[in-house]
Structures are given as structure tokens and as C-alpha cells.
């Protein structure tokens, strides 16, 4: 009888930047089917809709992910003035003089992906997953594919480690994002238990802020023609 040891394949691991909103929750649900270990990281930056932190904690437990870390990055609140970091600044539907919405938080995704990269290095994870999207994005420059690729390159070079930033929603519209949740039989969970609203209202939200408008329009488009939207999602499967 052989006494040689058979090495066990190392577990595949991913870190999901997890806010508790529709997009990141959908990415988390998908990741649970693709990786042995899924670790969520949520950032407390003193955000206007900070109820999302408790939502993220609740969903992490409900979905039974491997671990969930909430990281204090409230320094960002001091540096970045935005409607999402200042309660006194109302969320506007109009763009600012620089062409960006007043909900844009300068440097937010730069900081989040940097810290997620450090955490992935610590865990030995090969992937960071984030729910940013260029197709239906809200005008944020740090949601663009070019930005994500630049961040990935910086992390790989700066830590001398192979690490991928995966963006499952990058080329999906909101209707297709709803379809992706439905594909994993989690449409109701994402619809009723996530928080996307800038005013901190769970589920369907306040119905007035830009995030709620985008979310509702996508849901309506999906529910009106599920078959067509699901087919378009399947056709884009390499990106989903």
C-alpha cells in the first residue's frame, strides 16, 4: 500500500466588494456558484445610505458566505464631498458643472479596490469581484472598464501577485442584471431585501432618487419581456 500523500487542490477564493445593493448582491450570488470560498468586504465610509451596511450583514448571513468583513474607511467622508457623504447636500437629478452627478464620491472605487486587493492578498484569493457597470452606469468615471483594467494592472504590479478584478455586470443593462438574479432563483431576494436607494429605503426604495429610477426601469423592462431579456443575457454569457 502506498504511503505517498496526494496533494489536495487549493480552494478557489474570491473577494466580493459587497454593499448590499442590487448589483453587488447579484455578483455575490453568482460567485457562490463559481468559487469554493466567497469573502465579502463592505466599506463604512459614513455614507448617506449607511443602512446598507446592516443590509449587507444580513444578506451575508442569509447567503452563508465564507466570511464578511466590514471595514471602517470614514476618512473618505472627510476628503470626498458628495451628496452621498453629506446629509446636507440633497441628491440631485441634474449634473454638476463638471458633468458628473452630485452623488459621485471621488476616489471611492480606487480606495475600495485597493483595500479589496490587499484583503485578497491576505486571503490568497485569486479574484476581486465588483458590480460596477458601464452600460447603465450613473456617470461615474470609476465604473468604467478602462478604470477597472488600470486598477487591476496597478494591483498586480504593486503586489507582484496574479489577481483578477472581475466585473460580471460591466456590459449588462439593468434588465439583464435582474435576469441574472432570476437565473440563480434569487429574483425575490434581490428585489425585496437589497438596498440600492440613495435615501436608504430597502427594496423598491424611495422611488425618487436616480438609483431607484434606474433600478425600477430595469425591473419593469425585465418583467415585461422575461424571455427576450434572458435570451440576451445568455448571449452575453462570457461577460456575465
From Swiss-Prot:
Keywords: ATP-binding, Ligase, Metal-binding, Nucleotide-binding, Queuosine biosynthesis, Zinc
Cofactor: Zn(2+)
Entry EC number(s): 6.3.4.20
Matches recorded under InterPro entries: QueC, Rossmann-like_a/b/a_fold
MF terms (GO), sorted A to Z: ATP binding; ligase activity, forming carbon-nitrogen bonds; zinc ion binding
Record-listed Zn(2+) binding positions: 197, 206, 209, 212
Pathway it works in: Purine metabolism; 7-cyano-7-deazaguanine biosynthesis
Keyword Ligase included in the entry's annotation: yes
Gene Ontology biological-process annotations: queuosine biosynthetic process
Positions contributing to ATP binding: 18-28
Cofactor note as given: Binds 1 zinc ion per subunit.
Presence of the UniProt keyword Cytoplasm in the record: no
Catalytic activity: 7-carboxy-7-deazaguanine + NH4(+) + ATP = 7-cyano-7-deazaguanine + ADP + phosphate + H2O + H(+)
Coiled coil: none
Role summary: Catalyzes the ATP-dependent conversion of 7-carboxy-7-deazaguanine (CDG) to 7-cyano-7-deazaguanine (preQ(0)).
Family: Belongs to the QueC family.
Name of the protein this chain belongs to: 7-cyano-7-deazaguanine synthase
The encoding gene: queC
Amino acid at each position: 500500500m502506498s504511503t505517498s500523500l496526494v496533494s489536495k487542490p487549493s480552494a478557489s477564493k474570491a473577494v466580493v466588494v459587497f454593499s448590499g445593493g442590487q448589483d453587488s448582491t447579484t455578483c455575490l450570488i453568482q460567485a457562490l456558484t463559481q468559487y469554493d470560498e466567497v469573502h465579502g468586504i463592505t466599506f463604512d465610509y459614513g455614507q448617506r445610505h449607511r443602512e446598507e451596511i446592516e443590509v449587507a450583514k444580513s444578506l451575508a448571513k442569509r447567503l452563508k458566505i465564507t466570511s464578511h468583513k466590514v471595514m471602517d474607511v470614514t476618512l473618505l467622508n472627510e476628503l470626498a464631498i458628495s451628496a452621498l457623504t453629506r446629509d446636507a447636500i440633497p441628491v440631485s437629478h441634474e449634473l454638476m458643472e463638471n458633468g458628473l452627478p452630485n452623488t459621485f464620491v471621488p476616489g471611492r472605487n480606487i480606495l475600495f479596490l485597493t483595500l479589496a486587493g490587499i484583503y485578497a492578498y491576505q486571503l490568497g484569493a485569486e479574484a476581486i469581484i465588483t458590480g460596477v457597470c458601464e452600460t447603465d452606469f450613473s456617470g461615474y468615471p470609476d465604473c468604467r472598464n478602462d478604470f477597472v483594467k488600470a486598477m487591476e494592472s496597478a494591483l498586480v504590479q504593486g503586489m507582484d501577485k496574479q489577481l483578477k478584478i472581475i466585473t460580471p455586470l460591466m456590459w449588462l443593462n439593468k434588465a439583464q442584471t435582474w435576469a441574472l438574479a432570476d437565473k440563480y432563483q434569487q429574483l425575490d431576494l434581490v428585489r425585496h431585501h437589497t438596498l440600492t436607494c440613495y435615501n436608504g429605503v430597502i427594496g423598491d426604495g424611495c422611488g425618487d432618487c436616480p438609483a431607484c429610477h434606474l433600478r425600477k426601469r430595469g425591473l419593469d423592462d425585465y418583467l415585461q419581456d422575461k424571455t427576450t431579456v434572458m435570451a440576451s443575457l445568455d448571449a452575453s454569457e462570457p461577460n456575465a
